[in-house]
Amino acid sequence: MSWAALLGLLAVLLLLLLLLSRRRARRPGEPPLDLGSIPWLGHALEFGRDAASFLTRMKEKHGDIFTVLVGGRYVTVLLDPHSYDTVVWELRTRLDFHPYAIFLMERIFDLQLPNFNPSEEKARMKPTLMHRDLQALTEAMYTNLRTVLLGDSTEAGSGWQETGLLEFSYNALLSAGYLTLYGVEASPRTHESQAQDRVHSADVFHTFRQLDLLLPKLARGSLSAGDKDHACSVKNRLWKLLSPARLASRADRSSWLESYLRHLEEMGVSEEMQARALVLQLWATQGNMGPTAFWLLLFLLKNPEALAAVRAELKHTVWQAEQPVSQMTTLPQKILDSMPVLDSVLNETLRLTAAPFITREVMADLALPMADGREFSLRRGDRLLLFPFLSPQKDPEIYTEPEVFKYNRFLNPDGSEKKDFYKDGKRLKNYNMPWGAGHNQCLGKSYAINSIKQFVVLLLTHFDLELGSEDTEVPEFDLSRYGFGLMQPEEDVPIRYRARL
């Protein structure tokens, strides 16, 4: 062996000894500490491979709170839903989401905003997504869903069309959402402008989808050289498609877009960075609706009883309306709010497939009180992680047969929404958490729910839809998506559909 090789080996051994000598020890009052067997890396490989399975094993070993070493970071994981409120409503001076959000914003979207304050941004966006302008957004989304779905079906004719269910759902919802938030070709609309809207929004979707597929690797910094080149090309294309200059000529732009662009200009953000911010917002506002609709429709197609119940509810609701759905230019909120069966199906779908990480950076040494009276010390500089996918959403103590889709799980016997779920004999406040909670709950929740329900209504009233094969199975999750919102399937599910004449 050469001297160079020996020196290299010695350096590696010295580095390992240094890392081992600096390994953290658990202090009195702290959660159980699990460092794994690999210095510095700790459990990073297991966590990245399948976070849900890894955290399930850790919970079985240590209980509902523990600290693990993951790639040089100490992450305290809390899996007691009774104690979540303590975390999600804690002051930012103690537990803060912002540093992690800024880290992901820069790593995934190459976005740097001067004096960025997520709380101020949320306050600016809240009226345009939740209260003042929600009705206008909902009406515009319905119009654009009709443009995307019914225009395509008219052009395609009455025959059966074959595609993938995820491709179909994701394309329709993101395309319509893009037109709703970022504007349309012309107003008033013509057949020609609507055809251009379909082409342009489909281009946005297919380009965005390429970035979406790379998102987990971008977040973890694990892109190959080829992936990096592809990601760079896709981002540049999206920045051009969503540049403020290109969007300036679009009609019927949402008040959300106008308000957000004013906010960026007031911060002194360059047009280049504004385009990057708009790509980020496209993902934040639209990235989960398509996958949600995919799982919801798949569960309905695999469960005839559930599909029949939704159809019966829709028929009853529409019968009470003043005109048939096929003639409605808008779907009134009172109709959307009168679908408890569809609401239960949506909640059950989200329970089974929504798997975001709720993270906070520990800004100061603090004591974390648990709902059962215990108290644990957290260290400044660590990260705190909640994973509601494991508990409450898949907790067998809360839900019987938690792996099974039950369309009426969130319905009481009288047909009203069920909200009473229990763990350890106590009623849960947080029994299903697909939208986050506390200071960082999703602002677009109502808009997203309305959009998904409108999509399902249009699909069931205007199309025949069936699986490509009777023995189609529900696909496994793409395990790399844990932590990023809605799970996506390992592979798409073939379907066929046709417009009803």
Swiss-Prot record:
Q: Where would you find this protein in the cell? A: Endoplasmic reticulum membrane
Which amino acid positions bind heme, per UniProt? Answer: C442
State the Gene Ontology terms under molecular function: heme binding; hydroperoxy icosatetraenoate dehydratase activity; iron ion binding; monooxygenase activity; oxidoreductase activity, acting on paired donors, with incorporation or reduction of molecular oxygen; prostaglandin-I synthase activity
Cofactor or coenzyme needed:
heme
User: Predominant location of this chain?
Assistant: endoplasmic reticulum
What protein name applies here?
Prostacyclin synthase
Q: What EC number(s) does the entry state?
A: 5.3.99.4, 4.2.1.152
Question: TM spans, by residue?
Answer: 1-21
* Family classification: Belongs to the cytochrome P450 family.
Is Transmembrane a UniProt keyword of this protein? yes
- PANTHER family for this protein: PROSTACYCLIN SYNTHASE, PTHR24306
Q: Which residues bind substrate?
A: R107, L113, N288, T359, R360, R383
Enzymatic reactions: prostaglandin H2 = prostaglandin I2; a hydroperoxyeicosatetraenoate = an oxoeicosatetraenoate + H2O; (15S)-hydroperoxy-(5Z,8Z,11Z,13E)-eicosatetraenoate = 15-oxo-(5Z,8Z,11Z,13E)-eicosatetraenoate + H2O; (15S)-hydroperoxy-(5Z,8Z,11Z,13E)-eicosatetraenoate + AH2 = (15S)-hydroxy-(5Z,8Z,11Z,13E)-eicosatetraenoate + A + H2O
One Pfam annotation reads p450
Gene3D superfamilies to which the protein is assigned, alphabetical: Cytochrome P450
Q: List the record's Gene Ontology CC terms alphabetically.
A: caveola; cytoplasm; endoplasmic reticulum; endoplasmic reticulum membrane; nucleus
User: By its UniProt entry, which CDD domains does this protein fall under?
Assistant: PGIS_CYP8A1
Gene name of this polypeptide: Ptgis
**Biological role stated in the UniProt entry:** Catalyzes the biosynthesis and metabolism of eicosanoids. Catalyzes the isomerization of prostaglandin H2 to prostacyclin (= prostaglandin I2), a potent mediator of vasodilation and inhibitor of platelet aggregation. Additionally, displays dehydratase activity, toward hydroperoxyeicosatetraenoates (HPETEs), especially toward (15S)-hydroperoxy-(5Z,8Z,11Z,13E)-eicosatetraenoate (15(S)-HPETE).
In what way does this protein cross or attach to the membrane? Single-pass membrane protein
Ordered alphabetically, the record's keywords are: Endoplasmic reticulum, Fatty acid biosynthesis, Fatty acid metabolism, Heme, Iron, Isomerase, Lipid biosynthesis, Lipid metabolism, Lyase, Membrane, Metal-binding, Prostaglandin biosynthesis, Prostaglandin metabolism, Transmembrane, Transmembrane helix
Q: Which GO terms describe its biological process?
A: apoptotic signaling pathway; cellular response to hypoxia; cellular response to interleukin-1; cellular response to interleukin-6; decidualization; embryo implantation; icosanoid metabolic process; negative regulation of inflammatory response
